[in-house]
Amino acid sequence: MTSNFSQPALQLCYENTNGSCIKTPYSPGPRVILYMVYGFGAVLAVCGNLLVVISVLHFKQLHSPANFLIASLASADFLVGISVMPFSMVRSIESCWYFGDAFCSLHSCCDVAFCYSSALHLCFISVDRYIAVTDPLVYPTKFTVSVSGICISISWILPLVYSSAVFYTGISAKGIESLVSALNCVGGCQVVVNQDWVLISFLLFFIPTVVMIILYSKIFLVAKQQAVKIETSVSGNRGESSSESHKARVAKRERKAAKTLGVTVVAFMVSWLPYTIDALVDAFMGFITPAYVYEICCWSAYYNSAMNPLIYAFFYPWFRKAIKLILSGKILKGHSSTTNLFSE
């Protein structure tokens, strides 16, 4: 970061305060660019995920266990965009925390909770898609609204309990008190946890990721087999073309849903892997990562919260139609909730 500016005197976050952190701001050009890039990510995360939530909750055709999971995932990403990214943006660019120690703890707690909540949501969505594709006949009875509600509850409660334990009990700093004290200064909001909790954090990312990889590998194998069977059945039974054609459309829709959510999972892993590896390496190598590398890894993870609505808009025609209805104000009309979003 220091390579981007040149100042004859040392700058502090709080000039007239003892123990202030050193300020290492960017020069005006890069500073403006970073505010635009980070700000765009926050706005996209807020607006895009809000559109997803409104779409699922308003249109009755989208009231399904799977879509409730997607809406809950969008809620987590929305909260990242509105309560985490704006303040992290200021901290990253100004290299100072101007919002007080109490809000630093709350901000860090929300950061971890909402991000890990996204990971658990994606894991449960993978389970949902696995059942839908591999056992479609019993899927409606296996993955019900109540089951979806349980998955959503777990996806929120576990991350909130974990993050509260990390930032409000002090147990994550045991054994590294001297390091925490050395890094402590006025105007700083740096999260430092011991190796045990870093390993726990890594497992919270690694285990859901492995589950998702295994399930989606099986999903695409089964989907490929189903596609071949349906194609063979349709070509060999012309007399039942209408029925078989309907089955083919249903199977195709399920495969497309699995593919879309598979892209979402890949985007999550690509976005979060650099940060997760960096955090693990830092904990065991004495925090050797340069500040600018850490910021790149951190914002790569944050930007994942803005990606999902773009993925839905690209792959889901119903979401594009819902966006048009919302932005045009047509959802305010009577009976708009019964609009057929799947019509061609």
UniProtKB/Swiss-Prot annotation:
Changing Y302A: Abolished trace-amine receptor activity. The chain crosses the membrane at residues 32-52, 68-88, 112-132, 147-167, 196-216, 261-281, 283-303. One of its GO terms (cellular component) is plasma membrane. Changing C96S: Does not affect trace-amine receptor activity. Changing C185S: Decreased trace-amine receptor activity. One of its GO terms (molecular function) is trace-amine receptor activity. Disulfide bonds join C21-C185, C104-C189. The keyword Transferase does not apply. Pfam families: 7tm_1. It comes from the Eukaryota. Glycans are attached at N4, N18. Disruption phenotype: Mice lacking Taar2, Taar3, Taar4, Taar5, Taar6, Taar7a, Taar7b, Taar7d, Taar7e, Taar7f, Taar8a, Taar8b, Taar8c and Taar9 show no visible phenotype or behavioral deficits. They however show an absence of aversion to low concentrations of amines such as 2-phenylethylamine, isopentylamine, N-methylpiperidine and cadaverine. InterPro entries: GPCR_Rhodpsn (IPR000276), GPCR_Rhodpsn_7TM (IPR017452), TAAR (IPR050569), TAAR_fam (IPR009132). Keywords: Cell membrane, Disulfide bond, G-protein coupled receptor, Glycoprotein, Membrane, Receptor, Transducer, Transmembrane, Transmembrane helix. Residues 53-67, 133-146, 217-260, 304-344 are cytoplasmic. It is found in: Cell membrane. In addition to the well known disulfide bond common to G-protein coupled receptor 1 family, trace amine-associated receptors (TAARs) contain an unique disulfide bond (Cys-21-Cys-185) connecting the N-terminus to the extracellular Loop 2 (ECL2), which is required for agonist-induced receptor activation. Belongs to the G-protein coupled receptor 1 family. Olfactory receptor specific for trace amines, such ascyclohexylamine (1-MPD). Trace amine compounds are enriched in animal body fluids and act on trace amine-associated receptors (TAARs) to elicit both intraspecific and interspecific innate behaviors. Ligand-binding causes a conformation change that triggers signaling via G(s)-class of G alpha proteins (GNAL or GNAS). This is Trace amine-associated receptor 8c. It comes from Mus musculus (Mouse).
